[in-house]
Every structure is written in C-alpha cells, then in structure tokens.
C-alpha cells in the first residue's frame, strides 16, 4: 500500500512539474534581456540556469551555445512585436503578461492565436540567428554558403555576405522544438495532440523565413553604370513574414489527434495542411470579456474605430456593449519645409480629435 501511495505521489509531482514547465516559456527571453556573448563570464552553466522559461533540453543547448542566447531573445522579441502589430485591431491583441508565461493562460489553449504565436516566434529566431551569422557575431557560423542560383546571369558575381538562413533554420529547429520533443505523453492523448500542433506551427514559422529569403544585388561601376553586379542571399523584411503568417492564420486548419498519435482534419473535405500551414486543435476562447480561467483580457477600455465595419470597428471590437467618446489632443509635425542644404524644418501642430473606447 505505501508503495502505491509513493507511485501516485510521484506521478502527481511529475504532472505538476510538467504543468509548471508549460506555464513558462523561452519567449520570456524577450522580456528579460540576455547578456551579449562578450559579457559572459567563464563558465556558461550559471548563466543558463538563471534564464527563466527554458526546458531541460533548451538549457543544455544554452550551455553549448551560450553566445546564441542573446539572439534567441532578440528573435522572440521580434516575433512578439510582429504579433502585436498583426493583431492590433483584433479583440485578442497579443498582449503580454509580466511573468515567464509571457502571454498568460491563453497560450494553454490550442487555438488559432496560439498557433500564430508559435509560428511567428520561431520565425523570429530564424531571422535573428541568420542575421547574427552574417554579421560575424557567432563563432559557429558565418556568411551564407547557399549555392549560386541557376537563373542568375553569368556576368553577375555570387558571393556577397548573405544572411545564413540555412544555419538559422537548423538552429531554430533544434532549440525551439526541444521543448516539445522532450515531452512524453500517451499516444493519442490531448496532450500529445497539442505537442504535434506546436511542432507543426513552429515549422511553418521557420519555413516562412526560409522560403521568403531572396537574392539581393548591388551595382558596381563608374558613375553608377552598373557594369558589374554582386549578389547574395537576403532575408525578407520581417513584416512581410508576419503578413504571410497572418494569411496562414486566417486559413488555419482545425485538427484532432487520432489513436495512432497523428493529427487529422476535423473536416475531411478540407485540403490536408502542408508543413507551411498553421493548425489548431481547440476553438478560440471568448475574447470579449475578461476571464482569468482562459486568460482573456476582454476588450473593455480598448480603442475602437467608430466608422469602421471591420474588426477594429466599435460594434465588433466592443462586442455590442457600446462605447464611450472622449476628446484627445494630438501633436503632429506640419508645415515642413526643405532648407538648402540639407535639412527639413517643421512646426508642431495640435489637433483635438474624437476617440472611442469600449465599455
């Protein structure tokens, strides 16, 4: 009997530890700036053990690649900022919480919003690591070694220092996915379905950066004659990556886990998602009202657009509760003039405008 009690207690503690780990995230590196590589003292382990939100596997990678951690933090921050831009006019606006969970309890639900957040943060890491390689900030990588594109004109040179998106992709996959791959849930369980969902969306985010990287060229020659061009691989602007992932969010596929431990479409009439698509396993919670159990902050106090019929319009944003009007003073640059040579001088103009907030 005592042995059964011990086994039950151990299982309970293991579940509690898993829940505690899941409540935190490596995303918290965005909110807690990581020291630059040159600032590390000898011996990485104490530094890595103090970083919040890392899983055991990610902590080991931190010890092996300590100089990467600052750029993982930058990538997470880039992803969060892009998330907030893309959802700035939605009921859920990608708000962050002041703790290691970053987004609060809302991320415990396998919704479309969670899918997008995983994708855009994984994309942010690929972006940051790829660029750090090009800039010579990491000892394990350098400029891109991508083969010369076949369609590049023969007289154009290939070999400028490009963004190392291959390395960025591989490292982001190893680090970001480590958290999911070390989990061991029963095959066909809801928990395993959530792991598969996260892995799919992480991959979709990484592929968005990888696929959108393109050839950039610079002209050389007397008086801008462009008699010679040097070309290299360059990352797309991250805003374009965010736009692409937002499109994937809008067309995300509803999935469920099978007994064999695979994800399948809830509606088999829809097209099977590719590795570049987002998937979700839970319906989105009600973002209209504040709900501590789901993590929804509600829309009370949010600004809305009285004349818009879209999601930012007062009718939809305020969920039919109505809105309050108030006057706001806005200061803008105006009457700008160019002076030779070479600067622009502007005046400051104030304007009183009507604004609206949800009840």
Swiss-Prot record:
Annotated GO MF terms: cytokine activity; frizzled binding; signaling receptor binding
Modifications made to the protein after synthesis: Palmitoleoylation is required for efficient binding to frizzled receptors. Depalmitoleoylation leads to Wnt signaling pathway inhibition.
Cysteines joined through disulfide linkages: 83-94, 133-141, 143-161, 217-231, 219-226, 288-319, 304-314, 318-358, 334-349, 336-346, 341-342
Keyword Lipoprotein: yes
SMART domains: WNT1 (SM00097)
GO CC terms in record: cell surface; endocytic vesicle membrane; endoplasmic reticulum lumen; extracellular exosome; extracellular matrix; extracellular region; extracellular space; Golgi lumen
Localization of this protein: Secreted, Extracellular space, Extracellular matrix
Keywords tagged on the record: Developmental protein, Disulfide bond, Extracellular matrix, Glycoprotein, Lipoprotein, Secreted, Signal, Wnt signaling pathway
Biological process according to GO: canonical Wnt signaling pathway; cell fate commitment; cellular response to retinoic acid; chondrocyte differentiation; fat cell differentiation; lens fiber cell development; muscle cell differentiation; negative regulation of canonical Wnt signaling pathway
Cleavable signal peptide: 1-17
Chain residues carrying a lipid of type O-palmitoleoyl serine: 223
Residues annotated as glycosylated: 93, 99, 291, 305
Main location per the UniProt record: secreted
Family note: Belongs to the Wnt family.
Subunit structure: Interacts with PORCN.
Function text: Ligand for members of the frizzled family of seven transmembrane receptors. Probable developmental protein. May be a signaling molecule which affects the development of discrete regions of tissues. Is likely to signal over only few cell diameters.
Protein name: Protein Wnt-5b
Provenance organism: Homo sapiens (Human)
Record lineage: Eukaryota, Metazoa, Chordata, Craniata, Vertebrata
Gene that encodes the chain: WNT5B
């Amino acid at each position: 009997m005592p042995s059964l009690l011990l086994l039950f207690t151990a299982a309970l503690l293991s579940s509690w530890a898993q829940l505690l780990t899941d409540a935190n995230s490596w995303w918290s590196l965005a909110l807690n700036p990581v020291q630059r590589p040159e600032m590390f003292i000898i011996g990485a382990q104490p530094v890595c053990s103090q970083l919040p939100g890392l899983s055991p596997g990610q902590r080991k990678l931190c010890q092996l690649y300590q100089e990467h951690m600052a750029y993982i933090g930058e990538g997470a921050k880039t992803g969060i900022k892009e998330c907030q831009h893309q959802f700035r006019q939605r009921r859920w606006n990608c708000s962050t919480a002041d703790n290691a969970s970053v987004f609060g309890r809302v991320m415990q639900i396998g919704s479309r919003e969670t899918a997008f957040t995983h994708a855009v943060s994984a994309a942010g890491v690929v972006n940051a690591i790829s660029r750090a390689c090009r800039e010579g900030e990491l000892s394990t990588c350098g400029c891109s070694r991508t083969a010369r594109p076949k369609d590049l004109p023969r007289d154009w040179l290939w070999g400028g220092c490009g963004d190392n998106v291959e390395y960025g992709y591989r490292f982001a996959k190893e680090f970001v996915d480590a958290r999911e791959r070390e989990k061991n849930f029963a095959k066909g369980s809801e928990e395993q379905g959530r792991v598969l969902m996260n892995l799919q969306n992480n991959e979709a985010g990484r592929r968005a950066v990888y696929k959108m990287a393109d050839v950039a060229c610079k002209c050389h020659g007397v008086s801008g004659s462009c008699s010679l061009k040097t070309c290299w691989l360059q990352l797309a602007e991250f805003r374009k990556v965010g736009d692409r992932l937002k499109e994937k969010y809008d067309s995300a596929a509803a999935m469920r886990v099978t007994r064999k431990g695979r994800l399948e479409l809830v509606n088999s009439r829809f097209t099977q998602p590719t590795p570049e698509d987002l998937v979700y396993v839970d319906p989105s919670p009600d973002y209209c009202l504040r709900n501590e159990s789901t993590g929804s902050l509600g829309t009370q106090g949010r600004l809305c657009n009285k004349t818009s019929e879209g999601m930012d319009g007062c009718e939809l944003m305020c969920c039919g509760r109505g809105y309050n009007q108030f006057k706001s003073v806005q200061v803008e640059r105006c009457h700008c003039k160019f002076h030779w040579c070479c600067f622009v001088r502007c005046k400051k103009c104030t304007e009183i405008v009507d604004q609206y907030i949800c009840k």
